[in-house]
């Protein structure tokens, strides 16, 4: 997560303001499960409510039908194409919020962790993998999967209710370090050390633990 935590938060290409917020999306445009269709359904309602908002859509692929559909919004919807790792980090750090409207096929929300590390407000579909990372909405806002109307509502609420959004950002910043590879590696090694030293003793993990350590303990106990 370190490259995202250290990314510039003032890149003028991506930076939003209170009056003109930016909402970022990152994903393969022509891969349906990445959810661009869901975001496209939400955009008209958001722009009606927040006319100066800008949507920054990054990712490879054409999705020409959606591009044509959104062309009427002019500069309010910007297709960036594929972006470098450096630009990805700058976009996540500089944008007002990041939206992950994926509809399925996500085993772990690594992009949510990256956005959390960058310090942006996170909005995601309520897939189990995303809900787990965001602690059921404590670290980011969730919307009903595949529901563009609900996504629009959550984006508008996130932009308008700054104190609540900032509280989620602060909570996310306090826990995102647990996903750093150095931390995860240390935890994995600790689990293996524990397994070797307690080979004949059953280890009881903390009930309901969602940490990497807790999950590995569960696996070793089975």
Model-identified regions with their sequence ranges:
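Conserved donor-binding/catalytic core segment of Leloir-type glycosyltransferases
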Residues: 6-8, 13-34, 40-43, 56
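Glycosyltransferase donor-sugar binding loop
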Residues: 26, 54-67, 81
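Nucleotide-activated donor-binding/catalytic signature segment of Leloir-type glycosyltransferases, i.e.
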Residues: 66-87
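Short alpha-helical donor nucleotide-sugar binding micro-motif in glycosyltransferases
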Residues: 82-83, 90-95, 110
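Short hydrophobic beta-strand element within catalytic cores of glycosyltransferases
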Residues: 97, 121-124
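Short Ser/Thr-rich beta->loop micro-motif in glycosyltransferases that lines
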Residues: 100-104
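Conserved acidic donor-binding segment of nucleotide-sugar-dependent glycosyltransferases
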Residues: 136-137, 141-148, 157-163
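A charged, aromatic-enriched C-terminal amphipathic alpha-helix characteristic of glycosyltransferases
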Residues: 163-193, 200-201, 205-214
């Amino acid at each position: 997560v370190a490259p995202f935590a250290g990314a510039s938060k003032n890149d003028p290409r991506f930076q939003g303001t209170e009056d003109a917020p930016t909402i970022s999306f990152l994903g393969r445009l022509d891969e349906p499960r990445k959810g661009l269709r869901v975001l496209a359904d939400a955009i008209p309602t958001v722009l009606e409510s927040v006319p100066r908002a800008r949507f920054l859509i990054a990712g490879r692929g054409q999705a020409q039908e959606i591009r044509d559909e959104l062309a009427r919004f002019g500069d309010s919807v910007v297709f960036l194409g594929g972006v470098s790792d450096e630009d990805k980090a700058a976009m996540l750090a500089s944008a007002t919020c990041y939206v992950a409207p994926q509809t399925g096929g996500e085993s772990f929300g690594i992009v949510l962790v990256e956005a959390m590390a960058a310090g942006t407000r996170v909005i995601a579909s309520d897939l189990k993998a995303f809900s787990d990372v965001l602690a059921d909405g404590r670290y980011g806002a969730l919307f009903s999967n595949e529901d563009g109307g609900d996504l629009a509502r959550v984006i508008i609420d996130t932009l308008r209710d700054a104190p609540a959004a900032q509280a989620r950002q602060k909570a996310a910043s306090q826990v995102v370090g647990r996903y750093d590879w150095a931390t995860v590696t240390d935890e994995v090694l600790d689990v293996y050390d524990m397994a070797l030293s307690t080979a004949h003793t059953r280890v009881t993990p903390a009930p309901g633990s969602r940490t990497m350590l807790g999950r590995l303990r569960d696996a070793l106990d089975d």
